[in-house]
Amino acid sequence: MDLADAAQATADEPARSAGWRLNDGQRASLRAIARRLPENGLIIADEVGMGKTRIAVAVARAVIDCGGRVAILVPPGLGYQWRSELRDGKVQSPLLLRSLWQYLCAWQNDDPALREPWFDERAVLISHAFANWSLGGNRQAWRWRLLPALCARWREPRRGSQSSRRGDRELEYLRRAVAGIVEAASIDADAPMAQRLTTLVGDMMPADGRRMGLNDAAAYRSGGTLRPALERAVGAGLGAFDLVIIDEAHKSRGDDSGLSRLLDNVVLASPSARRMALTATPVELDSGQWEQTLARIGADTKAVGNVIERYSQAVRRVRQCIGNDDARDAYKAAASAFRDALARWVLRRDKRNDRYVQAFARMAGEPGHAYRREREIVVDTGQLDDGWKQAVCAAESLSFVGRQADADWSSKATRLRLTMGNGHGIATLMDQATHDAEADRKQEEHDQTAAAEPVRADPPSDTDDKARQRAQFWIDVATRPFGGGQGPLYDHPAILAAVNAIEAVTRRGEKVLVFGRFTRPLRALVDLLNAREMLTCLDAGKPWPQSKLHDREWPAVQAAHRQLKRAGPLERSELEHALEQNYRTLESEREKYRGDLLSLIEQGWAGDTSNPWAKNLFDAFGRAADMQRVGSADANPRALVARAMHALRGGDLERRDPLAYAAAFVELVEATSDRDVEQVDMDAAGDADFDDVDFDAAWKTIEDRLNEEFNRPEGGFARLMHGDTKPETRRMQQLAFNRAHVYPRVLVAQSMVGREGLNLHRACRTVVLLHPEWNPAVVEQQIGRVDRLGSLWESLIEAGRHVEQPQDVPRIEFCPVVFKGTYDEVNWRVLHERWEDLRAQLHGVVVSSNLADRHPELASWIEEINDAAPNFTPPPESTAEPSGVMQRTAQNDDQFGARDPGQERRG
């Protein structure tokens, strides 16, 4: 079977029982890939949320069905999503390879027949960060000894190797790995594994007798002389791959990045291997990044650069001269050349061909791309009180005087100016805003003089002193609004504007996703949202899942009381009493879920053998519950699980449907289990090997995580996800956020954490951007968290086909908070310019339709320009087929090539 036939077979399969099926656009992409991949590598640049991963799984399966092997390089946080998609697509894969120790553990079994070497796996998931090893110095020798051991054994294979000392398992695993790799490579001296080992030995142990100092630990450090050779040695143990899939291929573009080292040194390619890069943003900040992305798949970029640059120049000119015939003709010629130059390597489906976007265009009478609407949350400096107006003006003044002061003052002044609009700079100056300015200034001047005296040769000049005094004056003015010291960020105009916009969305029953960069303002936003919602619920007699008020929350509650204009003074003791009474009512409601909890879950399992991992954990849960039959939610596993299920499922459990109870328990298990012991893959007989799994210990870990998650002090209306948020907590937050009627209603995510790898689209279509970004690709990724297949927006379009007014057609909304009169207004303007360039190259939107609304006389020219934009969409299928949405019941009869059943599982 060749690749085209295998891909066709995968595309034509009926829906699997779990609903895994390619839609029409994905099937067209798969056929186009099957035609082009034998000739060269490919970039799959589908827009965010259109199912690139599923296409890649289908391609991987087709390659495996043809007898090939596949390496899949993914960001560290996406292993779970990839494993899930591979499992649904019936592609067997070990756990995500993250470390050298995990690499060696493939040879941990004492019985050689039960070992699972990486080179025997048909598909291997590898973390982008796999090659970021900490080596050299005092690090353990086993971390780098693979290279000298492999070279010695390959040079003299008959010599063998001695067993390691008893109990030295690292070196024993290393010895087994070396023996296994050499044995496998020896089967075919012309194969890639043998060729790489021969080259390594030739480089490290040349015939003239020289040695490369293979036992010098320092040479294996990052940048060390032997580091690349060790990377190639490790790659030999992974075996040769016929297809290398690179997820998020726009990441780590530098030559020295971990991903680049994986591609250049670690991953061993077969002679006919191809690379397939997945990225929604092959170009981010400038058109030259096309060349970097193309280089990732081994494309020849020499002739492409000029074509890309000419297209970028033509786009800029035609935007400035829309009515100029020559500019339009030059643009159309450049667009055609751009498309022709990249078409052999690039496939991209965008929302122009999405049926929901097309339905929106018909309903709204607008271009399809208008389904996304930008709605600025404006902070108008002119409407602020005098203190804030002075603060904004003072921050801008710092741009003039800060550069005249010394480096320390200049840095402080610049930071305040650049971050005034989003609250970050204000947070860093809180201490200065809450003490006696005059007394503290004297102390600070004394400290500076004392610190400078030993090293300063010349006294400060009058100019330096005056510049510093001017900078200090403006800093004092900028921080004056916070002199009260009661949680200054809670009254920051940008945060208040965001709160009002967020609450307007939650009041209509939808959720809001917020992105920002700086932790302090994000935490202040979460605290304020929770405090306001808590007071609102108490006033309305609605349940609030919190029994005590903690000291850290009190400033936010005071601010919320003032902002909501609640009657009378705020007494903490009265508030805590109201919380306790409210919580008792909520606990009484939870009680009804606890009594029959175990029996209802067990009834839900009846006859279902599809998830033995979760079933074994349920049995462990039952044993733990029997040991602790009494107690509060803090101590009783039954009460804890009931609380968690109630929080995640809410009214779904009121029907007391055993299937709903069992499904809710499985969700808890999948979200809180360690991914290193996640649902174990089944072998051919349908049985899982759990002999070495301590399910009681595994359940205790889950119980601890549930305790941490559901016994938090805060109520949870809004939650914060930042860099230190644990993976299992992120999964729980994702699970709950995708449920329409449970907390959190607002998820506030730090940009670096939440913009990739999370699906947050099932109950949310609104994204608030609290802090400005410079990179439009980042904003695309952020909006893409809610703009995905199966989103709330799609369901609203489906339900609202007969909407009366075009302006009422549902849209996905992204809402930047723009503080007018501060530097972030400039930031947003620059971002918009870059975003327009990105859309011209990837989205087919060279000139915004908003311009046509303002200038109808330009409408036909704008349509002409946008219609000529490069389009890399694969051609549609020639025959109509039933919608993938309707086919959900067909059984899967996938077949793999013959394998030893013992090699089909690692988990």
Task: Spell out what each predicted region is.
Residues 770-773:
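Short beta->alpha connector loops at strand-helix junctions that form conserved
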Residues 271, 763-764:
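Short, structured coil segments at secondary-structure junctions
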Residues 767:
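Substrate-binding groove of N-acetylhexosamine-processing glycoside hydrolases
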Residues 758-762, 778:
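A short, glycine- and acidic-residue-rich donor-binding loop in the catalytic cores
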Residues 775-803:
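Conserved SF2 helicase motif VI
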Residues 1-44, 50-739, 748, 753-758, ...:
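Helicase motor interdomain insertion/brace
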